[in-house]
Amino acid sequence: MTGYSGFEDEILQLLNANRPATLTRRWLDWRYTQLPGVPPPKVFWIRLNDRPAVGMASLIFRRYWVNGEPRDVAVLGDISLKKDLRGLGLGRQLMAFIGRHLNSWPNHSAFVIPTSAAERCLSATGWTTAGRFVPHVFLMDPTDALRRTVRREWLARGIAAVYKRAIATGLRLTGPRRASLQLVDDVDETFDTLWRQFPKRNLILRDMSQETLRWRYIRHPDHRFRAAKLMTEEGLTGYLIFEVGQQDRTCRIHDILVKRPRDLRRMLVLFAQHVQTMGHPSSIRIVLADRHPYGRSLWKSGFVARPAQSVFQVRSAERGFNQQAWHLTAGDKDV
């Protein structure tokens, strides 16, 4: 086991050798950033004799709030093993080794969003599935989908035009009157004010202070994120963090927070109105944990739940930790 400092190049080389996408040192430094007040990252290696490492995994500590109290949760990630050594039990041995270290840190629970292959290995070494991630989709423009089912282009465009007019009318009639949406490229101190006021009892959620949001989104080396702020007579009462894909015409909401449950629909309707004026996105997509409190009311804003696509697992000495209400979004996956 080592830290991150001094092993950056070895980590980057091993990850790039075993993954289809090429990572950069700039991205890696961003990912392994040690935020104020949390322990430094831990890197676990598989080495055969004195040869270069053939496998690894890391624990990067992130601040979460558990039933209203701040906790440093170890997030497992960067699980990598050379292709010709897979299926030999080395991955399971590595997870068991990490598990023994976690057992020696009883104050630090652990969390992971695994691949399907890693999920089986983790389940066999003491990790418990705590929930699933469910995509919710608001279809703004069905043209692409209609082209696959309707043979005539003119007919697909005609049906899509009727659908889009109906959506525009519905959004206009249901739009809130005493609220507005502001789009910004940074997060200011009002985000901290909202975060301090947000009720954190009876749930588990990632720290969403101004400093954490700036690291995760504003300082991201590869993606450009924007924030949409819900403004009322009270000031900032909610926000969402989003990006618009250029390849798949999807607007992805990565994080979302509102002061009160009733503010959720107001913000999403205003945001859908904004996305419709952009012209390019064909859908809005938000991924939430299956027990996320917002998931139960997204349908009121035009979102349709799709089949769950992945799971998240936890490991903790605390009884019932895996059964709590996890307030997770796509933003909990650093990559």
Where are these regions (language model features)?
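Conserved beta-strand in the GNAT
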Residues: V43-W45, P52-R62, V75, S80, ...
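Flexible helix-coil transition and linker loops at the boundaries of alpha-helical arrays
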Residues: W65-V66
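A short helix-loop-beta-strand connector motif used in the catalytic cores of GNAT acetyltransferases and
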Residues: T33-W45, A130-R132, Y217-A228
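Active-site/acyl-donor-binding loops of N-acyltransferases
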Residues: H108-A168, V187, R216-R219, R226, ...
